[in-house]
């Protein structure tokens, strides 16, 4: 099977799960930036956990395709970087520079922590 197909199937699943999470949490009337933070944190954690477990798949014939499926396809599509950037840009246009900076710092920091925590859990 083509590598592109593995990435594509993972992306379809990731995008649909992102849509479902956004839809379900959107009913709670949370701030849009906070929703994006939750989804991106979940994706960062999942990617970290997956990458820490990759070594177990090395002996599997399709290990490279699994990496493509999950890391680029699924988790790449699940995260919402473009929405994150749009929110930052929108805050800057509204001259809410402190809120934009706060959103940037919190989102990147929590994303790195979630990724590292996923890596840590996968090695335990």
From Swiss-Prot:
The keyword NADP does not apply. Na(+) binds at residues 76, 79. InterPro entries: FluC. GO terms for molecular function: fluoride channel activity; metal ion binding. Keywords: Cell inner membrane, Cell membrane, Ion channel, Ion transport, Membrane, Metal-binding, Sodium, Transmembrane, Transmembrane helix, Transport. Na(+) is not transported, but it plays an essential structural role and its presence is essential for fluoride channel function. Fluoride-specific ion channel. Important for reducing fluoride concentration in the cell, thus reducing its toxicity. It comes from the Bacteria. The keyword Amino-acid biosynthesis does not apply. One of its GO terms (cellular component) is plasma membrane. It is a multi-pass membrane protein. One of its GO terms (biological process) is cellular detoxification of fluoride. It catalyses: fluoride(in) = fluoride(out). This is Fluoride-specific ion channel FluC 2. It is found in: Cell inner membrane. Its main location: membrane. Belongs to the fluoride channel Fluc/FEX (TC 1.A.43) family. The chain crosses the membrane at residues 1-21, 34-54, 66-86, 103-123.
